[in-house]
UniProtKB/Swiss-Prot annotation:
The gene is EL2. Keywords: Cell cycle, Nucleus, Protein kinase inhibitor, Stress response. This is Cyclin-dependent protein kinase inhibitor EL2. Its main location: nucleus. Interacts with CDKA-1 and CYCD5-3. It comes from Oryza sativa subsp. japonica. GO terms for molecular function: cyclin-dependent protein serine/threonine kinase inhibitor activity. The lineage of its organism: Eukaryota, Viridiplantae, Streptophyta, Embryophyta, Tracheophyta. Probable cyclin-dependent protein kinase (CDK) inhibitor that functions as a repressor of mitosis in the endoreduplication cell cycle. May coordinate biotic and abiotic stress perception and cell cycle progression. Inhibits CDKs activity in vitro. One of its GO terms (biological process) is negative regulation of protein serine/threonine kinase activity. Induction: By cold, drought, propionic acid, chitin oligosaccharide elicitor and flagellin of P.avenae. GO terms for cellular component: nucleus. Coiled coil: none annotated. The keyword Protein biosynthesis does not apply.
Length: 106
């Protein structure tokens, strides 16, 4: 069931401002018809700066100055024998035991 040729009418041409401007005698701004609007400045005046890594936190070593530490803490003085009692040094017998357990390279 097709339409008979006598009832067929072609569709009218699509309206275009440029076509209308060509047939009109008035001057139409050529930038306003069928164009995507663009900003006046096309390129940035200056480039943005490159991204930078954040700076690492500065390490601050606490320096011990007895003159500044008055009232903040106490300095402890120990004799060598007291220090050895707190932190026992490795004796020669322990060193020999460690050396005998090491595998030998042959």
């Amino acid at each position: 069931m097709s339409a008979s040729p006598e009832f067929y009418r072609p569709s009218p041409p699509a309206f275009s401002p440029s076509c209308a401007a060509g047939t009109s005698t008035t001057e139409v701004d050529e930038y306003s018809c069928c164009r995507t609007p663009t900003p006046g400045i096309r390129e940035p005046a200056t480039c943005p700066p490159a991204p930078r890594k954040p700076r690492p936190v500065a390490c601050r070593k606490l320096l011990f100055d007895p003159a500044q530490q008055q009232g903040k803490g106490k300095a402890i003085s120990l004799r060598l024998d007291e220090l050895e009692r707190l932190f026992r040094p490795i004796t020669n017998n322990a060193n020999l035991h460690l050396q005998t357990n090491k595998p030998t390279h042959t």
